[in-house]
Amino acid sequence: MEVGRSVFAAKGYEATSIEEVAQQAGVSKPIVYEHFGAKEGLYAAIVDREMEDLVARVSSRISQGSPRERFEEAVLAFMGYVKEEPAGFAVLTRDSPTAVARRGLTRVIDDLAQRVGDVFRSEFERAGYSSKVAPIYANALVGMVTQVGHWWAAEGKAFSTENVARHVAALGWMGLRHLPKDPSAPGVKREPKRRG
């Protein structure tokens, strides 16, 4: 699987062949087919393993501490994964076959947003906010962290992942810290509601 991960990360799903993976792993194609069925099976197994690793890293860091500490720990864990597992992050973020795409980064983001949303719900209720809007903020923050991970992997390596994570966490936390109960800007004109 390590060889498959490296090849998929470097070349993408479409350009990778089982023959190439088998050759680099020093085994025959039938061995790869016996274990994974087909290229999609190997890819799915790699995506599942990477997803489990990333979710476990983040989940283990958000179980304790203040809301701000948990948020910063989650960002640090995500950025740590991006830095320590560049091939895994590449596999999760590259184009993949439609059948497997739901297993990749989209599923990871959904899972992380759900976990962050659970934390937000309880904190919103405690602070007197509607917990119904927690998924909006959870998805926004998880999306922000994911996009910064893409940026760092592609061109942001002049910054340490710890520094990047702290900046992202500060931005997210300050936004949450000053969250108004009514997010409507007073001077923004709204379109009248249409009837019928």
Model regions and ranges:
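Hydrophobic alpha-helical connector segments
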Residues: 45, 59-84, 137-141
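Helix-turn-helix
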Residues: 3, 7-41, 45
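Amphipathic alpha-helical packing segments from all-alpha helical-bundle domains
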Residues: 52-55, 101-125, 135-140, 147, ...
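Alpha-helical DNA-contacting segments of helix-turn-helix folds
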Residues: 41-50, 92, 108, 112
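Generic hydrophobic, amphipathic alpha-helix propensity
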Residues: 1-4, 21, 46-50, 54-58, ...
